[in-house]
Amino acid sequence: MANDDPLGFRENSEEKLFQTCLEFVDVRLMLEPEVAAMAATNADYADCQKLQMLQREVGQLVDQGKDHIAADIEYHKQLAACTHNQILCNLMEIVVKGIPLFVKITKNDFAKSTVEQHRAITEAISAGDAQGARYGMITHLNSNRKRILKALTEQKATENL
């Protein structure tokens, strides 16, 4: 497994990519809600300011119809940084490598809802609301999971034509 593909996405055939993406979201659901909750508990003012800035940047890029993937990745990395836990930061460096593939598979049809979900997560973290941050992240990732399933259904329908 190459360092730039630690999750093994490129090792999969096209038909297995959807399953791999679902597995990726399952892992993110195990990890990121707790990252968000810990971030709400541990983030200081400067952490929250940076998270808010990144959240706004993602929103502006989406509103302008520009590529927002790099900013989205930085947002998720900042979430981990807000925990003040280096192991979580290291794990997030690996986890975010799957985000571009997810955007590709879902044809980026979720960008506007991502902005709203990120806003809710950011507000909860900034308010020190661990439960709100946790549930906001669960909502965000569950929405992502539904979009993968929708994309898979659409691909199967196209193949059956």
Question: Model-derived features: where do they sit?
Answer:
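Short linear motifs at protein or domain termini
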Residues: M1-M30, A37, E154, T158
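Generic C-terminal helix-cap and adjacent flexible tail
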Residues: K146-L161
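Conserved amphipathic alpha-helical segments that form helical-bundle/coiled-coil interaction surfaces
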Residues: F24-V103, V115-H118, T122, G132-N142, ...
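Short, 15-30-residue, compositionally biased linear elements
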Residues: N108-E116
